[in-house]
Structure formats: C-alpha cells, structure tokens
Amino acid sequence: MSMLCYTLIIAFLIGIWAAPQSEDNVPLGSPATSDLSDTSCAQTHEGLKTSRNTDQRHPAPKKVDDQELGSVANIIVDPKLFQKRQFQSSRVLFSTQPPPLSRDEQSVEFLDNEDALNRNIQAKRQNHPVHDLGEHSVCDSISEWVTKTTATDIKGNTVTVEVDVNLNNEVYKQYFFETKCRNPNPVPSGCRGIDSRLWNSYCTTTQTFVKALTMEGNQASWRFIRIDTACVCVITKKTDNL
C-alpha cells in the first residue's frame, strides 16, 4: 500500500514538473517563436513589396543633368552664359515667339538689339529705293528667319545647334536670319545685266560665321558656325574671246 502511495506522489511531482511553460519563457526556436518570426518576415516582405509598387507608381525624379541630356532642344541655360557672349550678330536672335516675316516689324521681343536691326534695315531701304528708280539686282535673293539643329563650325566640324533654350523659366528659340539665292540663273544667260558675249556668270550663295549657342559635350557653349548671308554673282571671262 505504501508502495502505491509513493508511486502516486512521484507521478504527481513529475506532472507538475512537466507542465507547459509560459510564452514569455519559450526557448528560441520554439513553435511560438517561429510563428512570430514568420509574421515579422511576412510584414517585412509586404512592406518591401508595397515600397516597390509605390516606387513604380511614383518614379524618382530625374536629375537636372538627366533632364538636360534627355532633351537637348530645351536645355536650361545659366543667364551668365549670355554675359560671356562676344561678337554678337544681328543675324542671330532669341525669341519667345516666331519672328516677323519682315524684319522692320516691332511686335516680337528679342534678347538681341531688335531696334538697332530694324533701323538699319529701314535705312537701307530708304537709301536704295529700288522700285522707284527701276533698279534691278544682279541676282535674286530670299531672306528669312530659320532654326537650325546642326551646322558647320569654324573648324569644319558638324556641331549641334540649340533650338530651344530655357532661360529664367522662359523658353526661347534661337533663330538665324539667312539670305540665299532664289535662282542661280535669274536670266537664261546667268546673272542679270552681265554681257553674256564676254562673260560667263551665275549666282551663288555665300556664307559667313556668326556666334551661336551650341552643345559641346554635355554643356552649352558659344561657337562660330556658318550660315547663308548673301547671294552674289560669279563671272568668268569666256576663253574664246582671249
């Protein structure tokens, strides 16, 4: 009987010692810890996924350099660059609006000295009243404002010309006033008014260099480029009259 009592007491003590421990004292690697780790990992993964989706919906803004390189036609220019400009030409201008068809209009705002250009053109027209005196040009020419994307510089290299320039949060276009021949032979014999019995003649467009805003590497810079500026008559003496 006493043996039975001892057996029951020992079984009771073993049961107490083997009772489940509290969650606060759960050893590392237990199922409860695994559940917490899995939950934390799931939350972290969900956070990364949400962050990735947010980045896709709202991509990071491009750097200024990336924006300038990606859009060469609308590069942001430091106003100090225009202070360093030298050898300004009346044939190069920057305008927020298309320039007038005739250069004596004053409805467009230019960065260059528009008034001086207009006065110069008007003075030339007053000093040379071609239509009133019946005078004629040796060659017929046409003049107009144009934009350029490429041109030949003073070294003979092909360079990129700026079309749109962002200056003080305003977009200006770079225009060039070009003059070229309308027809190489205004009359069947060549140039008008040339004695075809003694001379061979034809009209040709000549060029000159003007300072323009171009791209050099990743930066804007001033360079001399060729543009059409005049139409002249070229004559050669006929060999059969020598």
UniProtKB/Swiss-Prot annotation:
Q: Does the keyword Protease apply?
A: no
In which family does this protein belong, per the annotation? Answer: Belongs to the NGF-beta family.
Question: Which GO MF terms are attached to this record?
Answer: growth factor activity; lipid binding; metalloendopeptidase inhibitor activity; nerve growth factor receptor binding; toxin activity
Among Pfam families, the record links this protein to: NGF
- What subcellular locations does the record give? Secreted
Annotated tissue distribution: Expressed by the venom gland.
Q: Which UniProt keywords apply?
A: Cleavage on pair of basic residues, Disulfide bond, Growth factor, Lipid-binding, Metalloenzyme inhibitor, Metalloprotease inhibitor, Protease inhibitor, Secreted, Signal, Toxin
Task: Kindly give the InterPro entries that the UniProt entry links to this protein.
Answer: Cystine-knot_cytokine, Nerve_growth_factor-like, Nerve_growth_factor-rel, Nerve_growth_factor_bsu, Nerve_growth_factor_CS, Venom_nerve_growth_factor
What is annotated about its quaternary structure and interactions?
Answer: Homodimer; non-covalently linked.
Source taxonomy: Eukaryota, Metazoa, Chordata, Craniata, Vertebrata
User: Which Cys-Cys disulfides exist here?
Assistant: 139-203, 181-231, 191-233
Q: Does the keyword Metal-binding apply?
A: no
Which N-terminal stretch is annotated as signal sequence?
A: 1-18
Report the protein's function: Nerve growth factor is important for the development and maintenance of the sympathetic and sensory nervous systems. It stimulates division and differentiation of sympathetic and embryonic sensory neurons as well as basal forebrain cholinergic neurons in the brain. Its relevance in the snake venom is not clear. However, it has been shown to inhibit metalloproteinase-dependent proteolysis of platelet glycoprotein Ib alpha, suggesting a metalloproteinase inhibition to prevent metalloprotease autodigestion and/or protection against prey proteases.
Q: Name one GO biological process term.
A: nerve growth factor signaling pathway
Main location class: secreted
Q: Entry's SUPFAM superfamilies?
A: Cystine-knot cytokines
Q: Which organism is it from?
A: Pseudechis australis (Mulga snake)
Protein name, UniProt field: Venom nerve growth factor 1
Against PROSITE patterns, the record matches this protein to: NGF_1 (PS00248), NGF_2 (PS50270)
Give the pro-peptide residues: 19-125
GO cellular component terms, alphabetically, are: axon; dendrite; extracellular space; synaptic vesicle
